[in-house]
A protein has these predicted regions:
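A cross-taxon signal for low-complexity, glycine/charged-rich
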Residues: 241, 245, 249-252, 256-275
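Surface-exposed, charge/polar-rich loops and edge strands
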Residues: 1-242, 273-476
């Protein structure tokens, strides 16, 4: 099952930089405006590595990927980035307010290397589809930089909370605290005590993993692993044996360090801890126990644009064949129903439902099971019961006439976390219709994943995101 490793992370030297100014959200959540803000925040902001700006004069020899590699090497040479003196795991806690509420939650996990597996091994499970374009971009970056600067968000199940107890019950103060632009507090603890590390690794031995965020990076890393294995002369049979058994692996010597961290190994002889058979066989991941409180999944709303001749009332009439359609009128005070009111209507409706907001009116759609059943026959019962599946298959494809390829390419669809942003695009004329949906539940995601099925793209939005720049894994 899952195999984890401590590692000597490459990290920013907090005496050389303001940490708040150098970390970022994950690359695929960074808008052009956010990219500009990160560039302005610090000359050492990680944006220059994970999502640098393209230049009109870029060539095969000089481009966004070669600049990322040069930047990373320069920062290492300057001492802006330093490699840890010994392998460690990193406790990682995020304290945040659930969007749209006053509820405060804390999500706890830990950063380590995780051995890469093909999905066929049934150790790591996915829940969303991926796209070749996004993977080719990340592969080019990984090859140029020879570093993994962002974590993959992994879920596992452990009702005994063994790993969390080993990492977080020491009572030690975090060595790093950062509050991000969403007012999320991120705290990090370094764990170097080999006894604690071994306890955590052992606790994960029998676990399977679900990818919460980072499908493209995970699959790209797996591709890179296979390429590197071929270069090393490992055929597929040997590689499969290496990844599925527990061979004698090279060990990392934990030499003493001049400074002490928050959670450290005691004085004594250097300890031996396992390492991957070769660097590309593992990827940096954050592991979060799905049995613990603190996990939040937000909905990802959709707006459709470029629909020639679209009329909201004609759409509602057409939708009545498949849905019970209820128009949501102005509030008693006469105000137009905004995002908060529309979401209240949606969330007060039991079962599967979504809002179709148009410039001609806003409509609550609840499915007629007998009518939609013929459109879902090629899907499993689990997939059929997802709001997002019914939205895609019945509304986007059947009623709007879009197809899977155009949806995947984003030719007529945008994805938005905030319902207010979706309505703003509608009001400004940048969208023809906004679809507000309910979030996928953790139980639904788990069932889909473990049955080797997938959801439509952008089905889950785990909040908050893992910060990029807290730790990095270098392959050289």
């Amino acid at each position: 099952m899952a195999r984890l490793y401590p590692f000597r992370a490459l990290r920013y030297d907090p005496t050389r930089v303001n940490m708040t100014g150098v970390v970022t959200q994950p690359y695929d959540k960074i808008t052009p405006a956010m990219q500009d803000a990160y560039y302005a925040a610090s000359p050492y902001n990680l944006i220059r590595v994970i999502l640098g700006k393209h230049n009109p004069t870029d060539t095969a020899a000089e481009n966004v990927y070669t600049r990322a590699a040069s930047t990373l090497n320069e920062w290492r040479a300057e001492g802006i980035l330093k490699e840890e003196s010994e392998p460690a795991l990193y406790g990682y806690a995020q304290t945040y307010k659930v969007p749209g509420t006053e509820e405060i939650r804390e999500r706890r996990g830990f950063i380590a290397l995780g051995l890469l597996h093909d999905y066929a091994d049934k150790v790591v499970y996915r829940h969303e589809q991926t796209f070749p374009k996004h993977k080719s971009d990340r592969l080019a970056l990984f090859k140029a930089t020879r570093a993994y600067c962002e974590q993959i968000y992994m879920l596992y199940s452990d009702p005994t909370f063994t790993a969390e107890k080993a990492i977080f019950e020491s009572g030690a103060a975090p060595e790093l605290e950062i509050t991000d632009e969403y007012n999320v507090l991120h705290r990090v603890w370094k764990v170097t005590d080999p006894t604690l590390i071994t306890r955590v690794l052992s606790a994960m031995d029998d676990k399977w993993l679900l990818i919460a965020d980072g499908h493209h990076r995970y699959e790209t890393s797996t591709t890179y692993m296979h390429e590197r294995a071929a270069e090393l002369g490992l055929d597929e049979a040997a590689l499969s044996k290496n990844l599925s058994s527990r061979p004698e692996l090279p060990s990392q010597n934990l030499s003493s360090r001049p400074e002490r961290s928050a959670v450290e190994r005691p004085a004594g002889e250097p300890a031996q801890l396992p390492a991957p058979a070769f660097p590309e066989a593992a990827m940096m991941m954050t592991f979060v126990n799905m049995d613990a409180p603190g996990i939040t999944i937000l909905p990802t709303h959709r707006v459709a644009f470029g629909l020639i001749g679209f009329n909201g009332r004609e759409f509602a009439t057409k939708a009545e064949h498949y849905f019970t359609v209820e128009e949501i009128h102005a509030t008693p005070s006469g105000h137009y129903p905004g995002a908060e009111n529309l979401l209240k209507h949606l969330n007060d409706t039991p079962g599967i439902a979504f809002i179709a907001a148009t410039r001609d009116g806003d409509f609550l759609l609840t499915p007629k099971p007998e009518a939609i059943a013929p459109l879902l026959t090629n899907l499993s019962p689990r997939q059929q019961q997802l709001d997002v599946t019914q939205l895609h298959k019945v509304v986007l494809e059947k009623l709007l006439g879009l197809n899977e390829e155009t949806i995947r390419a984003g030719q007529n669809i945008r994805y938005l976390r905030e319902a207010s942003d979706a309505l703003q695009q509608l009001g400004s004329g940048n969208a023809d219709v906004a679809f507000l949906i309910k979030p996928v539940t953790l139980a639904q995601m788990r069932d889909i994943s473990l049955n080797l099925e997938v959801m439509p793209q952008k089905s889950t939005d785990f909040y908050p995101k893992l910060l990029s720049g807290l730790a990095m894994y270098t392959l050289d």
